[in-house]
């Protein structure tokens, strides 16, 4: 009996070590893939597809039939989702201001990604603002890594709660 315990405790098959390494390598390749996708995304629909994909990968949740609209809203609103609807309304004016001030597609895409992810999480049933801000950060960190602008922006927004 002691021999069996010793054997099981100290024996680590090489296959298990390789499986762990593959999982880490796969996560790094996913981070690179998502970073490349968000940096190259053209238009709101491209970013919207990344939002849905990263939320599904991170939380295992998705919602069909969501519609994205653009409207000119007050500047204190990035976007909104009215509970009970399939609509997310993105503030076109605010996005245009960020675009003209930064002149950086990468920053605009990160900004739009963060706002849409936030509202999509509300649409999935997460009502608490502080919970949603934390989830946006967690999803961003998992999918884009700690050093990407998406995660940096999500971190700043999370600190406001």
Model region roles, listed by residue range:
Residues 32-87:
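Extended low-complexity intrinsically disordered regions
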Residues 127-161:
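Post-HExxH zinc-binding segment in Zn-dependent metallohydrolases
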Residues 55, 59, 124-128, 147:
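Long, hydrophobic, amphipathic alpha-helical segments used as structural scaffolds
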Residues 69-109, 113:
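Active-site scaffold of zinc-dependent metalloenzymes
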Residues 110, 114-126, 133:
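Active-site recognition of the HExxH zinc-binding catalytic motif
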Residues 1-30, 34:
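N-terminal low-structure segments adjacent to metalloprotease catalytic domains
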Residues 43, 47, 109, 113, ...:
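Hydrophobic (often cysteine-bearing) scaffold residues that line and stabilize catalytic clefts
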């Amino acid at each position: 009996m002691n021999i069996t315990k010793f054997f099981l405790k100290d024996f680590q098959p090489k296959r298990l070590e390789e499986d762990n390494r593959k999982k880490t390598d796969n996560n790094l390749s996913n981070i690179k893939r998502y970073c490349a996708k968000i940096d190259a995304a053209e238009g709101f629909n491209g970013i919207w597809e990344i939002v849905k994909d990263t939320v599904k990968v991170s939380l295992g949740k998705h919602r069909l039939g969501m519609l994205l609209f653009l409207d000119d809203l007050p500047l204190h609103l990035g976007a909104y989702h009215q509970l009970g609807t399939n609509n997310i309304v993105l503030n076109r004016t605010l996005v245009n201001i960020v675009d003209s001030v930064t002149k950086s597609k990468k920053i605009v895409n990160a900004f739009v990604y963060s706002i849409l992810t936030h509202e999509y999480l509300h649409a999935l049933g997460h009502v608490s603002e502080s919970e949603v801000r934390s989830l946006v950060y967690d999803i961003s960190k998992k999918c884009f890594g700690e050093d990407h602008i998406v995660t940096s922006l999500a971190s700043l927004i999370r600190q406001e709660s």
